[in-house]
């Protein structure tokens, strides 16, 4: 089984990814847009490092559409417009970040939430990229029909779940084959406090 580490890079973290690669990361996920009025000007097209190629720097969208299909369409259009503007490689996955916060209402029905999520992912697929879905383990159990998502898009879930708030320096690769470090300044991947469970191959 391939063992893979990656980093989820926040906007306040260093733009030089060489240190992350040196610490063992083979992919990075970087925020591109949020809603329909924010673009990360330190986005994926500006991040480079030896070993972290155009196919392993993957943009995300932070959402605020909740269970609204019409809102999901607008956010997808905004996201894709920026992805094209930044000339994001079609080899990369584009990720939908659907979780509580930033105005995103997660209290809709599981079916309506899933319909909006799939509509967003469908737009990514139609534009020529492979879509992925990021959310917390709790929401994936209670608010999203992940079976329906996986049935349509295969291995595409990035699951946020922390086994403990204490530092975790090794990942359980018997559980998932890819892991990302949690955000904590510029600490090496192997020293970050906690791991996000990862089910998606890049």
UniProtKB/Swiss-Prot annotation:
Source domain of life is Viruses
State the SMART domains in the record.
Glyco_25 (SM00641)
Q: Per the record, a Pfam family?
A: Glyco_hydro_25
Q: Name one GO biological process term.
A: peptidoglycan catabolic process
Which residue positions are annotated as catalytic? 8, 99
Which keywords does the record carry? Antimicrobial, Bacteriolytic enzyme, Glycosidase, Hydrolase
Q: Which principal EC class is assigned to this enzyme? A: hydrolase
GO MF, one example: lysozyme activity
Q: Which reaction does it catalyse?
A: Hydrolysis of (1->4)-beta-linkages between N-acetylmuramic acid and N-acetyl-D-glucosamine residues in a peptidoglycan and between N-acetyl-D-glucosamine residues in chitodextrins
SUPFAM superfamilies with a match to the protein in the record:
(Trans)glycosidases
Q: What is its EC number?
A: 3.2.1.17
Q: Which InterPro entries match?
A: Glyco_hydro_25, Glyco_hydro_25_AS, Glyco_hydro_fam25_subgr, Glycoside_hydrolase_SF
Role description: Helps to release the mature phage particles from the cell wall by breaking down the peptidoglycan.
Q: Which family does it belong to?
A: Belongs to the glycosyl hydrolase 25 family.
Task: Give the protein name, as stated in the record.
Answer: Lysozyme
The scientific name of the source species is Lactococcus phage mv1
């Amino acid at each position: 089984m391939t063992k893979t580490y990656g980093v989820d890079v926040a906007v306040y973290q260093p733009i030089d990814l060489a240190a992350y690669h040196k610490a063992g990361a083979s992919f990075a996920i970087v925020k591109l847009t949020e809603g329909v009025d924010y673009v990360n000007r330190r986005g994926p097209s500006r991040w480079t490092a030896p070993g972290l190629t155009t196919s392993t720097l993957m943009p995300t969208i932070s959402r605020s559409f909740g269970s609204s299909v019409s809102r999901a369409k607008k956010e997808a259009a905004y996201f894709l417009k920026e992805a094209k503007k930044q000339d994001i490689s079609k080899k990369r996955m584009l990720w939908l970040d659907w979780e509580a916060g930033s105005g995103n209402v997660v209290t809709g029905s599981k079916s309506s939430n899933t319909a909006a999520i799939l509509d967003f992912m469908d737009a990514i697929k139609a534009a020529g990229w492979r879509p992925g879905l990021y959310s917390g383990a709790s929401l994936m159990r209670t608010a999203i029909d992940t079976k329906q998502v996986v049935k349509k898009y295969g291995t595409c879930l990035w699951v946020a779940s922390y086994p403990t708030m204490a530092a975790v320096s090794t990942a359980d690769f018997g559980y998932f084959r890819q892991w990302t470090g949690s955000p904590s300044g510029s600490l090496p991947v192997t020293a970050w406090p906690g791991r996000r469970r990862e089910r998606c191959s890049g």
